[in-house]
């Protein structure tokens, strides 16, 4: 059976006004995988942590696998019924987004995927930012489409707990 890993990061900031803090679930690199029927195991784990929102860090799909679009769409539309969802593209989405849908059927399917997600209220951030309110806190979430060559630059990770 496929497994996913839950990692907790704590980021401290004097700008966070609520004593409880802010809690996000971050999904990345699922590549169309399913964890239990209808991604039930993943959804239940997310619900257990009661996040204030869901941040997608890309690669929910595989650029040459149309089934991955269906799996990701189903999961994200389900999550969007309970949480605000913000989606930044990974390299698989980016390549499909930048490809002419007239020349590539997967790029055309990807456009439909984005439409489905937007209809469900998911914020897809193409080099954009949006503001959100979580309790007493105002936050800005950004989605950057970084040229793939820049992904070779190393950025250190926050402390894991």
Predicted regions and their residues:
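Short strand-coil-strand connectors
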Residues: 14, 133-135
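Histidine-centered divalent metal-coordination motifs
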Residues: 31-33, 91-92, 154
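Active-site-proximal beta-strand elements of phosphoester/diester hydrolases
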Residues: 21-31, 138-148
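Residue-level detector of conserved catalytic or cofactor/ligand-binding positions
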Residues: 151-161
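General small-molecule cofactor/ligand-binding pocket signal
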Residues: 12, 25, 123-128, 142
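Core catalytic region of metal-dependent phosphoesterases/phosphodiesterases
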Residues: 38-133
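N-terminal membrane-anchoring alpha-helices
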Residues: 1-19
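Short, glycine/acidic-enriched loop or turn micro-motifs at the edges of active sites
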Residues: 32, 62, 146, 160
């Amino acid at each position: 059976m496929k497994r996913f890993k839950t990692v907790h990061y704590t980021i401290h900031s004097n700008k966070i006004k609520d004593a409880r803090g802010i809690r996000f679930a971050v999904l990345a690199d699922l590549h169309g995988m399913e964890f239990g029927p209808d991604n039930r195991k993943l959804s239940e784990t997310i619900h257990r942590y009661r996040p204030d929102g869901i941040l997608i860090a890309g690669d929910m799909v595989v650029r040459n696998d149309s089934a991955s679009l269906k799996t990701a769409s189903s999961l994200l539309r389900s999550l969007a019924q309970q949480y605000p969802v913000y989606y930044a593209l990974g390299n698989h989405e980016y390549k499909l987004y930048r490809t002419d849908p007239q020349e590539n059927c997967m790029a055309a399917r990807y456009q439909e995927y984005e439409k489905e997600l937007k209809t469900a209220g998911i914020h897809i951030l193409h080099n954009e930012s949006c503001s959100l309110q979580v309790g007493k806190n105002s936050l800005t979430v950004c989605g950057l489409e970084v040229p793939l060559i820049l992904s070779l630059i190393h950025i250190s990770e926050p402390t894991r707990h």
